[in-house]
Amino acid sequence: MPALNTDEFMEGKTVEYVKLANGVEIPKIGYGVFQISKDDAPRCVREAIETGYRHIDTAQSYFNEAEVGQGIKDSGIDRKDLFLTTKIWISNYGYENTLRSVDVSLKKLGTDYLDLVLLHQPFSDTYGAWRALEKLYKDGVIRAIGVSNFYPDRLADMVAFNEIAPMVDQDRKSVV
């Protein structure tokens, strides 16, 4: 994978944020690591941070969380200055499975909290998984919770039948 052109991309630009319903601020643009190999992920993440990205978006199903964590560590950035998102894969849904899988993600990413955790797909035991995310949110382990790739009717169900509504409905957009 080619190196980022750090001289041009974010030169002189400031990071813009959006405030979520719970008051947490998320950078408008994030650096997604889907399909970045384990070999390339540490360098790519470090270079993205050096370039000015302040939101790193990963997922359990990308199989590179540990390498993303290494890239964050290598960058030397203070954790408080970075917004970190991961997504729970459907094989880790269900209350207990989700609690365990978030703990594994925390360890792989080398952090004691996550800024945003999303349910990656609208299949399997989404309600059990969501209740686990609600608990982790209330416990302060996760700063915001949401969904990704959910159909409008499934999103409406998540709002109607849970204590805490999703704070984010992620829809993939690429700038390149």
Where are these regions (language model features)?
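Short helix-capping segments at alpha-helix termini
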Residues: D74-D81, L109-T111, Y137-V141, N162-A165
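Generic structural signal for well-ordered alpha-helices
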Residues: V15, V45, E65-I72, L99-D103, ...
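N-terminal binding-site loop/beta-alpha segment at the start of enzyme catalytic domains
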Residues: P2-L82
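CE4/NodB-like, metal-dependent polysaccharide N-deacetylase domain
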Residues: T98-L118, K135-D139
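A short, structured active-site edge motif that brings together acidic residues
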Residues: R79-N92, Y113-P122, N149
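Beta/alpha (TIM)-barrel catalytic core signal, keyed to glycine-rich beta->alpha loops juxtaposed to Asp/Glu
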Residues: Y17, Q121-V176
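Conserved, mostly hydrophobic/aromatic
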Residues: Y31, A48, I56, V68, ...
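Short, acidic/polar
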Residues: I36-I49, Y93-L109, G128, D153-D157
